Curated annotation (Swiss-Prot):
Function summary: Involved in ribosomal large subunit biogenesis. Interacts with the internal control region (ICR) of approximately 50 bases within the 5S RNA genes, is required for correct transcription of these genes by RNA polymerase III. Also binds the transcribed 5S RNA's.
Predominant location category: nucleus
Compositional bias (Basic and acidic residues): 275-288, 305-316
Lineage: Eukaryota, Metazoa, Chordata, Craniata, Vertebrata
InterPro entries: TFIIIA_Zfn-C2H2 (IPR054599), Zinc_finger_trans_reg (IPR051061), Znf_C2H2_sf (IPR036236), Znf_C2H2_type (IPR013087)
Gene Ontology biological-process annotations: ribosomal large subunit biogenesis
Annotated segments matching region Disordered: 275-339
GO terms, molecular function: DNA binding; RNA binding; zinc ion binding
SUPFAM superfamilies, A to Z: beta-beta-alpha zinc fingers
Keywords, comma-separated and alphabetical: DNA-binding, Metal-binding, Nucleus, Repeat, Ribosome biogenesis, RNA-binding, Transcription, Transcription regulation, Zinc, Zinc-finger
Protein name: Transcription factor IIIA
Start-end of C2H2-type zinc fingers: 13-37, 43-67, 73-98, 105-129, 135-159, 162-188, 192-214, 221-246, 252-276
């Protein structure tokens, strides 16, 4: 009787970190793996200006080619002259374009011997013979066709639209994804609250600007025109003030027929447009709030609740912001106010 063959023992290198069962057949692979736990990258790139590091020499060598631009791996196909930076990239290319064993979908048109790995690739190719795109829209009355399924799927949304899923009672259907996102932002965004005064705002940007009014020290932008003492919390509001009050520019005109009104700010035009749209007027929730002038809105300084009515009236009469004069020193068109 012949001797029994001894079983082949494969040495495994096991990760010693708790809750990690990774194991490898080579020691260098384990060392590279351990770097994921420790965060070490012992193989830094020595190219000037490149601060990348790698867990193994193999990865560093592969990266170094990006600096030299060398392409030492030629395609295995005799009919192809393409070269690649890595062997892996060359193999991917070969399997995709030259490995006929993987191409099971053959074109049956006379004189064409092309084959493809995927059925949809064959259908796209057949367009060159039939001049008919393979993926037709199933919607009744629509005769559009597309070359790939993804384009058809995107087109079908034109018919189905984008129904709102934020609220079961909301019947909105957006014709485009952009209109859907705009609807969600305007109608379903949860309001954000100021921690100090409990005032709520529709958008985080509004809250961020509002919080500046609570700071002990804040930068305000003063109007540089002689005789004008107005100041604003943002540079944009200062520019809007100068355009509307000093230069009398109102670039946002209402496009509704027989309405010649124009506004200095886009938001003012949007608020005004509701007047011409009965549907929007029905949907718009009415919440009691004091009337404020453009100057008051731009300044970012809201009068106390008890004095809101008198302040609003004074603003309308005088055309100026009702506020206490700030103390501070002017620096480059701005003031640092201490409360």
């Amino acid at each position: 009787m012949g001797e029994k063959a001894l079983p082949v023992v494969y040495k495994r290198y096991i990760c010693s970190f708790a809750d990690c069962g990774a194991s490898y057949n080579k020691n260098w692979k384990l060392r590279a793996h351990l770097c994921k736990h420790t965060g070490e990258k012992p193989f830094p790139c020595k190219e000037e200006g490149c601060d990348k590091g790698f867990t193994s020499l193999h990865h560093l060598t592969r990266h170094s080619i990006t600096h030299t631009g060398e392409k030492n791996f030629k395609c295995d196909s005799d009919k192809c002259d393409l070269t690649f930076t890595t062997k892996a990239n060359m193999k991917k290319h070969f399997n995709r374009f030259h490995n006929l064993q993987l191409c099971v979908y053959v074109c049956h048109f006379e004189g064409c011997d092309k084959a493809f790995k995927k059925h949809n690739q064959l259908k796209v190719h057949q367009f060159t013979h039939t001049q008919q795109l393979p993926y037709k829209c199933p919607h009744e009355g629509c005769d559009k066709s597309f070359s790939v399924p993804s384009c058809l799927k995107r087109h079908e949304k034109v018919h189905a639209g984008y129904p709102c899923k934020k609220d079961d009672s909301c019947l909105f259907v957006g014709k485009t994804w952009t209109l859907y996102l705009k609807h969600v932002k305007e109608c379903h965004q949860e309001p954000v609250m100021c921690d100090e005064c409990k005032r709520t705002f529709k958008h985080k940007d509004y809250l961020r600007n509002h919080k500046k009014t609570h700071k002990k020290e804040r930068t305000v932008y003063c109007c540089p025109r002689d005789g004008c003492e107005r100041s604003y919390t943002t540079e944009f509001n200062l520019q809007s003030h100068m355009q509307s009050f000093h230069e009398e520019q109102r670039p946002f005109a209402c496009e509704h027929a027989e309405c010649g009104k124009s506004f200095a700010m886009k938001k003012s035009l949007e608020r005004h447009s509701v007047v011409h749209d009965p549907e929007k007027r029905k949907l718009k929730e009415k919440c009691p709030r004091p009337k404020r002038s453009l100057a008051s809105r731009l300044s970012g300084c809201a009068p106390p609740k008890s004095k809101e009515k008198s302040a609003a009236k004074a603003t309308e009469k005088t055309g100026s912001v009702v506020k206490n004069k700030p103390s501070g020193t002017e620096t480059k068109g701005s003031l640092v106010i201490e409360k």
